Amino acid sequence: MLHFPDPFATGPGPVIPAEALGFILAQGLRECAAGLGPLTARLGLSGADLAALRDRFAPGLELPDLDLPRPEAGPDQQAIETLILWRAGVATPEARWLAAILARRSMETRHLWEDLGLPSRPWLSGMIAHFLPGLAAANARNMRWKKFFYRQICSDAAFSLCLSPSCDDCDERAACFAPD
């Protein structure tokens, strides 16, 4: 496992478990190694943003694809990223990076924490609470994150069609509505 120093240990600001970003980067790197695309496409960030994230949380870590632009995002991914940034309550580079990563990984098929490579849902919720406090507060009912994102988007009167993922056919439906 990759080990990352906590850049907030001696400075002000939100405290984010650097290990969580290690899991996310490791997941992206595994997918790159498996031929699923460049790291920029796996995490939804430009190479420059990946380099800045690396410099902040994992100085010296070798990352591929740092010369690539940010991949184009589809409408669902853009809507989720906009929602996250709007609800976040903070305007930091770290919040912007995490919003892009969460939106991109929300396009995958499993639970968001699994698609991020995190050990459990509480890791995801804890990272969001530290990094995107307004988003965490908005999810007061502790709804599963992907479901929460789509419910928030679909509740907007401007949306006439919502492509929310269907839970009824999922084998893990009971787990989604169980306490953490």
Curated annotation (Swiss-Prot):
Q: List the disulfide bonds.
A: none
Q: Which GO terms describe its biological process?
A: nitrogen fixation
User: What would you give as a GO molecular function for this chain, any one?
Assistant: molybdenum ion binding
Does the keyword DNA damage belong to this entry? no
UniProt keyword list: Molybdenum, Nitrogen fixation
Coiled-coil residues = none
The protein's role, per its UniProt record: Probably involved in molybdenum processing.
- Which family would the database say this protein is a member of? Belongs to the NifQ family.
In its UniProt entry, what is this protein called?
Protein NifQ
Taxonomy-wise, where does this protein's organism fall, top ranks first? Bacteria, Pseudomonadati, Pseudomonadota, Alphaproteobacteria, Rhodobacterales
Q: Which gene encodes it?
A: nifQ
